[in-house]
From Swiss-Prot:
Lineage: Viruses, Varidnaviria, Bamfordvirae, Nucleocytoviricota, Megaviricetes
Alphabetical UniProt keywords: DNA replication, DNA-binding, DNA-directed DNA polymerase, Nucleotidyltransferase, Transferase, Viral DNA replication
Region (Disordered), start-end ranges: 638-657
Listed GO biological process terms: DNA-templated DNA replication; viral DNA genome replication
Role this protein plays: Replicates the viral genome. Host DNA polymerases cannot substitute for the viral enzyme in this process.
InterPro entries with a match to the protein in the record: DNA-dir_DNA_pol_B (IPR006172), DNA-dir_DNA_pol_B_CS (IPR017964), DNA-dir_DNA_pol_B_exonuc (IPR006133), DNA-dir_DNA_pol_B_multi_dom (IPR006134), DNA/RNA_pol_sf (IPR043502), DNA_pol_B_thumb (IPR042087), DNA_pol_palm_dom_sf (IPR023211), DNA_pol_type-B (IPR050240)
UniProt catalytic activity: DNA(n) + a 2'-deoxyribonucleoside 5'-triphosphate = DNA(n+1) + diphosphate
Listed name of the protein: DNA polymerase
TM annotation in the entry: none
Tagged with keyword Transferase: yes
Pfam families: DNA_pol_B, DNA_pol_B_exo1
Enzyme class: transferase
Keyword DNA-binding: yes
Family: Belongs to the DNA polymerase type-B family.
């Protein structure tokens, strides 16, 4: 190799370990010539330089490591070590790994439990195959054709007693952590060499020693010139349940929009119509048209164009669930899948299909979300980015999102237009050419909007910053979310501090300190979910209007609790767990957990409220009465008496009807009619909060090691400090691009710090530790209760509402003329009583008036420092900020609440509701304002059901359904009848999604379906319909349904303000009576 440069700076975005094979010959001890396949691992880094050119850095051979843990009391002394190393060496598969230098004793601290440093065996392998073969041979695992026992070690220790660490840690993660290099970010190299042969399609390719590569700090705020493109397809699909698999399916158009403002259009059309179509579209030289005679040529041309662009990322809208699925299905049918997948930069490594969960093997179903995993080119779904970032959008169609974020949208092209063009693909008349130009423009605009949305919201910057901070590949950050990021992050920290990170929990989960009960069903006959700890503290507000309300918040409560109390895998243990440290080294934390038991405050309050209605029932001679609210709109759909939940005992009274409120209660119950109504509603709320039959009644006690700092506190403290530094640096940066990078960086630090707590509580996660999760939650409850008590005791400030880490306090005359200063002083006083570094912060907003309706449900109006109030209201947890209500219902609710904040009377409130309801009945509300959206999950093929072992329920995709009594017979003979049965058991939105597929409509984007509620005559008919289909085929909107939708939410407002639950029903009663008369007349004359 020739040296060609002393080094450069590159932005790395994709690391890959390539497994290479080489056949070598050798002679055994008997002199026989034998052939050996040598497998090695080679590391590559795909980068771009400062000009945006793609670069591949080949860093030579790397090794993957494994740690072996022997039983706790097994000493690896010199007497045993020689025999142990010989046994381990014999179990190694690869010849090059059979050397003493590859097998070493090392001292590491165990991750779980308060234990001191122990001795482990570290073994390096030249291939992943060799590492897996070694593990199987030592532990005795094998396939069914091989009979193999575990290895035997001195003093009766067998291989199945050993535990392996780093067995699931990717090789590139091990290498990059050891070399202190980022998964994404700027790096600086030493001397670069020109390789003898090229392995990639990159613009430049070098060989470099990984020891001469380091992270670049001088270019941290320099925006990387990443070239990207977005793509979209148009296809004729006959069966949307399995797109692309039908013999008559066909992909006939693909568009590509590149970040350098150029576009490509690949389509099936008559030869020579490209230029004419560009003129019809009004496109210039920025658009290149590729005309293909058939579908195979189109797929091959798509592959050729993608490779010629030289982009580092390809993205689309909903490509994982539609475009990639269709392309792969068509390529498989046309026998060109290998060529299609050759979309990456590597010449010697073909692309592969991977699910978004990371599976690259086995058969993929049409319902699997997949992407094309290729070296050097990231495959991203922009819709998934928006779903994870903007979780409250009512729908995720490209048309809606682009209108909301870009202020523009695509031209409306109907399914009829698309099907007509497909039927006339090879025609060259004026009508076909005009239609082809319209559809082509529609397809190109789809790609342009997708690319613009990604650039507008800086999603690539968000992904790269999160990848850099958490040491996780960009693709993994995009698809696999929190647990995988925490696994990579914890591995990096463990490797840096000499901790043996456990990553295999399949054989003995007791080492994770979970202390779980038996899960085989023998100890849990009734299939109830066993609780291990209770949740955060919530103080419910008393519904009503409050003046002058301030808010306090525990800043990063769970992360700072981990720092304050040294909470970590290696410091928190059960009270009776063994430890290498003595008792004086521990801090004891004790508390009680009560969920669903007789000590649960919710249970106590529920029993008290039930006794009121039971006493009333006795006066009425044990007449069957209900506990539901007073109006008929709160009545249950069935009068069948059911227990409140599985925990309560049988009661003679579990209902309360309207008529009883007008009777005279017994003398011992001095409650008004309104109080009884509120008690009934409160009883219903408490019922909804019951634990679903699960019970927890326990005194908890854990020990926390004080003498050694844990990994999690250090990690969380680093992230919080780094975020403060980045936020401070943002104030001094004027460049918008650099400021955008810093903003995404500080957000990544915040999200990661808050994710640490959540990852410990995930029982089936990558690194579970419920001892940490439960003590953190308990200390959080203690902290917020202590803060409420301090505010009341020291400053006479009462707390109206508290939830997890926040407090809403009532400000009285003591706040004076400057309530902001008073709240800040209150926060500082509470902070002085808490353990450092915990801080209570005063929110900047003081509300002049707040309407509290319930838990996480309140509306406020801000107070400005000049004494004026905001014209806008802050909405929290009410229907105006939820996705499952129509715009009309939200508008009615918003107008009515605004009248409440304008100090209207109850009659004025009723008049506002009546006017809005009358507007609807007079058909002065557009269909678009009546449209609702709802989430739709996977329904599979609507015939195949599986048994969920956790709940022992039959599942149709993601929905629970009853099994048909003749399922097996119908599945093989009459699948249509079976499909009709199971679809009828689905919720209405899911049934509508199936109907759309049967009609040949495109797949639902973003998993949310848009529909109208319509009037039906047959109860078995579907009461909802997709809006475009409704406009084409007609129907009657069920306007009464929308009026009923406003009754419950506004009744809560009326109860909170005027203590009346009949206000709203009184306002809409004339409308309801009018509708009833109209329907009777329709029945009489029709």
């Amino acid at each position: 190799m020739d040296s060609i440069t002393n080094g450069e700076s590159f932005y790395v975005y994709d690391w890959r370990v390539v497994s290479t094979e080489k056949d070598t010959n050798y002679f055994d001890r008997s002199g026989n010539r034998k052939k050996w396949t040598e497998i090695t691992l080679m590391l590559r880094a795909y980068c771009v330089d400062a000009n945006g050119a793609t670069v591949c850095l080949r860093m030579g051979q790397v090794k993957t490591k494994l740690y072996v843990e022997f039983p706790e009391n097994y000493d690896l002394n010199p007497r045993r070590w020689s025999a142990i190393r010989t046994i381990l060496k014999d179990a190694i598969y690869c010849k090059n790994d059979k050397c003493d230098s590859n097998i070493q004793r090392v001292s590491l601290q165990p991750l779980y439990g308060a234990k001191q440093v122990r001795t482990y065996v570290a073994i390096e392998f030249t291939s992943e195959v060799g590492k897996r073969a070694f593990i199987n041979k030592i532990s005795g695992k094998c396939d069914q054709r091989t009979k193999r026992t575990s290895a035997k070690f001195p003093d009766n220790v067998t291989g199945d007693q050993l535990r392996f660490h780093w067995m699931n840690v990717p090789t590139e993660l091990q290498v990059l952590v050891n070399a202190k290099l980022p998964f994404a970010g700027w790096i600086e190299t030493g001397r670069l060499y020109s390789p003898k042969d090229r392995k990639t399609r990159c613009d430049r390719e070098y060989s470099v020693d990984i020891k001469q590569v380091r992270t670049s700090t001088s270019m941290a705020c320099v925006t990387p010139p990443l070239k990207t493109f977005a793509w979209d397809i148009e296809a004729k699909i006959n069966d949307m349940s399995s797109p692309g698999t039908h013999e008559d399916d066909e992909v006939y158009m693909i568009s590509i929009s590149v970040s350098d403002n150029t576009d490509h259009l690949i389509l099936i059309a008559p030869d020579g119509c490209g230029e004419a179509m560009k003129r019809s579209m009004g496109a210039g030289d920025e658009l290149t048209v590729h005309v293909c005679p058939n579908e195979v040529s189109l797929l091959l041309e798509f592959n050729k164009v993608c490779r010629s662009i030289g982009a580092v990322a390809r993205m689309g809208w909903n490509v994982n669930r539609f475009d990639c699925v269709v392309l792969m299905a068509r390529a498989n049918r046309l026998n060109c899948s290998t060529t299609l997948l050759d979309l990456g930069l590597a010449l010697d490594v073909p692309g592969c299909v991977s699910t978004t969960a990371g599976r690259t093997f086995g058969r993929f179903s049409p319902n699997d979300a997949i992407y094309f995993d290729t070296h050097g080119v990231l495959c991203l779904d922009v819709m998934e980015m928006f779903k994870s970032t903007y979780t409250k959008l009512p729908k995720y169609s490209l048309q809606y999102v682009s209108q909301k974020f870009l202020g523009t949208t695509k031209d409306p092209v109907t399914l009829k237009d698309l099907n007509e063009l497909h039927s006339r693909l090879m025609l060259d008349d004026d009508h076909t050419n005009a239609l082809r130009a319209v559809v082509s423009k529609y397809c190109v605009v789809d790609s342009r909007l997708t690319l613009q949305l990604c650039q507008k919201c800086a999603h690539m910057t968000s992904l790269t910053e999160m990848a850099r901070i958490t040491n996780t590949p960009i693709t993994m950050v995009h698809y696999q979310k929190q647990q995988r990021r925490m696994f990579h992050l914890m591995f990096s920290e463990c490797a840096r501090k000499g901790v043996a990170m456990q990553d295999d929990f399949g054989r003995d989960r007791r080492l994770t300190m979970l202390d779980e009960d038996s899960t085989d069903g023998s100890s849990n006959v009734d299939n109830k979910r066993q609780l291990n700890y209770s949740g955060a503290y919530v103080k419910d507000p008393e519904p009503g209007l409050y003046n002058m309300v301030g808010s306090l918040d525990v800043n990063s409560m769970y992360p700072t609790l981990m720092i304050a109390y040294n909470l970590c895998y290696s410091t928190v243990i059960d009270d009776d767990a063994h430890s290498d440290y003595t008792d004086e080294n521990f801090e004891i934390v004790e508390w009680e957990d009560h969920v669903g038991c007789e000590h649960d405050p919710n249970i106590k309050e529920r029993e008290k409220l039930k006794s009121i209605f039971e006493d009333l029932a006795k006066v009425e001679k044990r007449k069957f009465i209900g506990v539901q609210p007073i109006t008929k709109y709160f009545k249950p759909t069935s009068t069948t008496r059911k227990p409140v939940d599985d925990v309560e005992e049988h009661s003679e009274c579990n209902g309360f009807t309207d008529d009883n409120y007008n009777d005279s209660p017994v003398s011992s119950i001095k409650l008004s009619s309104v109080d009884l109504q509120r008690a009934a509603i409160r009883l219903k709320v408490l019922k909804s909060r019951m634990s679903g039959g699960s019970k927890l009644c326990a005194k908890q006690r854990v020990r926390i090691l004080k003498t050694r700092r844990g990994l999690l506190p250090d990690l969380v403290e680093y992230f919080l400090d780094a975020r403060r530094k980045v936020r401070a640096e943002m104030k001094n940066v004027s460049d918008p691009l650099a400021r955008d990078i810093l903003d995404k960086s500080q957000l990544a630090y915040k999200v990661t710090a808050n994710s640490v707590y959540g990852s410990t509580g995930a029982v089936n996660g990558k690194l579970p530790c419920q001892n940490v999760a439960k003590v953190t939650t308990a200390l959080g409850r203690k902290t917020i209760l202590q803060s409420i008590d301090i505010a009341q005791r020291d400053r006479s400030v009462s707390t109206i509402y508290s939830d997890t880490d926040s407090m809403y306090v009532q400000l009285g005359d003591e706040a004076g003329d400057d309530p902001w200063k008073f709240v800040r002083e209150l926060a500082a006083h509470i902070t002085s009583k808490l353990r450092k570094p915990m801080v209570i912060e005063a929110e900047d907003d003081i509300h002049a008036k707040v309407l509290f309706l319930g838990k996480k449900c309140y509306i406020g109006r801000k107070l400005f420092r000049d004494g004026s109030v905001s014209r806008e209201l802050d909405w929290h947890g009410v229907i105006t900020v939820r996705r499952d209500h129509s715009q009309y219902v939200k508008d009615v609710y918003r107008k009515a609440v605004h009248r409440v904040f304008a100090d209207c009377t109850m009659e004025q409130f009723k008049h506002t509701i009546f006017e809005q309801a009358l507007t609807l009945m007079q058909r002065r509300v557009s269909y678009e304002r009546l449209t609702k959206t709802s989430e739709v999950r996977n329904v599979g093929d609507c015939c195949t059901i599986t048994l969920c072992k956790k709940t022992m329920s039959w599942m149709l995709g993601d929905y629970k359904v009853p099994q048909h009594s003749h399922h097996d017979i119908l599945y093989n003979t009459k699948r249509d009848a079976l499909k009709t049965y199971y679809v009828s058991k689905l919720p209405a939105p899911a049934r509508l999604s199936v109907s759309l597929v049967d009609r040949g409509r495109p797949a639902i984007e973003g998993g949310r379906i848009e529909f109208l509620n319509i009037r039906i005559s047959n109860p078995d008919d579907l009461p909802i319909e997709e809006i475009s289909y409704f406009k084409e085929h007609g129907g009657i909107v069920d306007r009464l349904y929308y009026i009923k939708q406003i009754i419950n939410p506004l009744t809560k407002v009326s109860e909170a303000v005027w203590k009346r639950s009949d206000t709203v029903i009184g306002a809409v009663t004339p409308i309801l009576n009018y509708d009833k008369v109209v329907r009777q007349l329709d029945t009489m004359f029709n």
